[in-house]
Amino acid sequence: FPYTTLFRSDPFESNFCKFFLRNFNYLKLKRLICTSYSASPIVGQQLTLVGWDEEPIKRGNGYVMDISEIPMANGRGISDSDIDSLLKSKKSGVKRLKGDGDFRSDECIEYMKQADIVVTNPPFSLFREYVALLMKYDKKFLIIGNQNNITYKEIFPLIQENKIWLGCKYGDMAFRVPDYYKPRNTRYWEDENGQKWRSFGTICWYTNLDHQKRHEDLVLYKNYYGNEEDYPKYDNYDAINVNKVANIPKDYFECMAVPITYVDKHNPNQFEIINANDIRTNPDTPIKAHGLIKDKDAVITTQIYAKKRRKRLDTNSRSEEHTSELQSRRVI
């Protein structure tokens, strides 16, 4: 069934744009809409585009590309030169926006409303706002974000309610970067063609499109009973602590606090993600908007656990503050 796909991107040099143009027919798209933000530093760096008004694209106003047909050039898709020719033609579907292409503008929101699926890499600093718009207009989406977004008070409740989940790729991702990008000491390289690359270990896809990985059971090997000292209870929550996803016990069916990395492996048919506020055992423990076990309230003072922890520390200078820091990554 054909879809109308919207992606908000850097100008049409964006690999998001190129991917969907190349694969327009292969993906059986009905329509492709791309809104472009005028303040991007890569405007006009690779392609010189001409809008419907026959003026070259330049900074100031944003632009939109709205395409419903791409001629089959080489079977599956089209080449970069085909893309260049297409976008320079009067049939390119490119026109100037009234504003700068900010996704929060009325005209960009109107384009979002027309889309069946939204695919993009939103500004990380505006991730909350972008997701809020997607939810407001009930859009299917596939977007890139940081792993830390999981813990946002605006995001984690959506994950808990199975309104958002992670995509198939989680963690290490490599990205092409422009020629002007300055070399870095780590996670940076150039390939044999001189293309610059960077990789990031904290990037993932967020989506509400179902996929097979989401329904794969997490294989469990550990036992809780007989190893209770390895799973101490929290002082302020009715839950045991599990240090690693690999240590989730197969014979325990009550509440467990697990590392945030579990979310990538969550199968809603196998486990339920709950709100930590619902299992508070200390009435003085404040209600947390994000619903996680973290911060200073995520303490464990079980003597056996404290003894084992001290053995792993190099000195006795590590205090309860250190323990709280370790626990801050746990999630119900």
Residue ranges of each PLM-predicted region?
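Short, small-residue-biased leader/transition segments that mark boundaries at the very start
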Residues: 2-6, 325-327
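Class I S-adenosyl-L-methionine-dependent methyltransferase module
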Residues: 7-102, 157, 165-167, 171-184, ...
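Amphipathic alpha-helical repeat scaffolds
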Residues: 117-123
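A short, conserved alpha-helix within the catalytic core of class I
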Residues: 126-133
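Conserved beta-strand signature within the Rossmann-like core of class I S-adenosyl-L-methionine
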Residues: 139-152, 163, 167
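A conserved mid-domain beta-alpha-beta active-site/ligand-binding segment of alpha/beta enzyme cores
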Residues: 169-268
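C-terminal lobe and adjacent flexible extensions of AdoMet/dcAdoMet transferase-like proteins
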Residues: 228-320, 324, 328
